Structure formats: C-alpha cells, structure tokens
Amino acid sequence: MSSLALKIGSLLVRTLSKPIANTIKAQAKEHKAFRKACIEFAQWMHRAEFRITGINRAKSGGANVRLRPLNDAKAVDAGATFLSETFIFTVAGGAILFETWRARRKEKNRRDEVAEAILGLQHEIVRINEIMEKQFVLQKKKNELQSSTEEIDSTEKDFDELHKVILKVERELHTLRQNTPSQNEQAEATPSKEIPRETVSEKADHPPSSNTKSVSTG
C-alpha cells in the first residue's frame, strides 16, 4: 500500500467517524440499557469534575458548593457526547498510531535493506580480494612458466647448435676417410721386389771358379 492511499484511507475513516459518533449519540438516547450506562458514566464524570474544581476552589479560598447531580436528559446527552468523542479520538489515535508504526516499520525495513546491501558489498569485496589473490598467484605461475619456456628455448637452441657441429664433424670425417686410401690399397699400390729367374738360373749353372777357391784357401 502506498503512502498516498494510506493517508486517503485514514482521512476517510476520520470523516466517517463523525456521523458514526452522531449515530452512537442518538442510539444512547433511545436504547434503554445504553441510556442507563450513559447516565451512570455521566454522573461519575460530573462527580469527578466537581471534586477537582472543589479542590481548586478550596485552595483559592472560595466558598464550598454542594454537589448537585445531573438530570437524566443532561446525563444522557453528556454521556452520549463523551462516547461519540471517545470514538472519534480512538479512530484518530488509531490512525496516528498506525501511521507511526508503518513509518517505523518502513524505516526499519530501509535500515535492514541498507545493512543487507552493506553486507553484500562486504562479501563482494572479500570475493574480489580472493579473485585478485588468485590472479596474482596465476600471474606469478605464468611468469615462472614463461621463464621456464625461455630456458627451454635457449636449451633447444644450444642443442641445435651442438647438433650442427656434430653433423659438420661427421661430414669432415667422412670426407677425410674418402680422401685417405686404405692399407690394402697401399699394399696394392707398392711394387714387389722379385729376383729375375734368369739370374737365378745362371748362378746355378756356373759354380764359382778355381781362382776364387785359391784365394779363399790362402
């Protein structure tokens, strides 16, 4: 219910309370039991008012006055008037109390909403801090991984350079082996020193001469 509708409803109740009070006043004059209750209540109010005024009069030094009860017509009229005014006052007071209670409840709800919003913001701040911490850890790990990747790339480059050097050495060894003849090829390339057959046969057919013997004997 909106505040405007509530105020209009309260004004309507206050406006309707006046004719209702007049109806109560009329019923008090016509209804027997209601009339009796109004008379008793009006006489009680008259006595209470007289005592209060008598006390004030005595304090001010005035003369004592004898209490005279109200007649039935005045008592009924006074009682009915009091009841109607009491009804109007009750309706107006109830409307004021309801508006006050509604305003307090609205303020309490607003405070609760603000408290919930603050609590939600606090939880959001905690969640954001946790996310930032996780991002910091992830960034740190990312940096470490990037550093490791750079080291791996550098190592791979070193391996590539080493592999190139090895291939170069193997090619040079292969070239050197091709240019250097083997032992068998060297043996085949060296000529053999054979004694001619004719010389050997001549030595066998012609033994040493006698002159040679005499020289050797002497």
Curated annotation (Swiss-Prot):
Keywords assigned: Coiled coil
Compositional bias per record (Basic and acidic residues), positions renumbered to this chain: 194-206
Keyword Lipid metabolism carried by entry: no
Protein family: Belongs to the OPA3 family.
Cellular component, GO, one term: mitochondrion
Protein name: OPA3-like protein
Residue ranges of coiled coil: 129-179
Gene Ontology BP terms: regulation of lipid metabolic process
Feature: compositional bias, Polar residues: 176-189, 208-218
Species: Schizosaccharomyces pombe (strain 972 / ATCC 24843)
Region (Disordered): 175-218
